[in-house]
Amino acid sequence: MPTFKLVLSDPRSGKSKQLEVKDEVAQRLIGLRIGDVFDAQLIKEIIDLPQGFRIKITGGTGYDGAPMHPGIEGPVKKYALLSGRPGFRPEKKGLRVRRLIRGNTISDQIVQVNAVLVYPENWDKEPVIQVSGEAKPTEAKAEEKAEAAQ
């Protein structure tokens, strides 16, 4: 059975959460492509999201470290001539390099899937993914200044 990590990003809070996807839940995601949007209730065993939320797949990585590329169809692995992202960041304009990349379809060879949370249109509450235990940067700086003044 396939197992991979799902990195779920929240665009409103700017935070992300890494989730372990195993067995039956992972099997449901196999065959989806970059850009596909699915109902969050599909992975309700892993993360509890309110009704109406959707998840959009934005990319991923294979077991060999090769990134998924939206321009390559299917669950394949091949060498391609890249001039930019994803998979290559040129240092000079016009630079091209042949790199190993994966296709745009999730398969059992994928170890990490990147995704973004899509909010319902009428959602006006706080962000869903929040990292607890973090102090706000302004509060932390104020505490440091108070300690330094003493």
From Swiss-Prot:
One matching Pfam family is Ribosomal_S6e
A single GO cellular-component term on record: ribosome
Gene behind this chain? rps6e
Q: Which GO terms describe its molecular function?
A: structural constituent of ribosome
Which UniProt keywords are listed?
Ribonucleoprotein, Ribosomal protein
What family is this protein classified in?
Belongs to the eukaryotic ribosomal protein eS6 family.
Alphabetized NCBIfam families for the sequence: PRK04290.1-2
InterPro entries from the UniProt entry: Ribosomal_eS6, Ribosomal_eS6_arc, Ribosomal_eS6_CS
| GO BP terms, alphabetized | translation
Report the protein name in the record. Answer: Small ribosomal subunit protein eS6
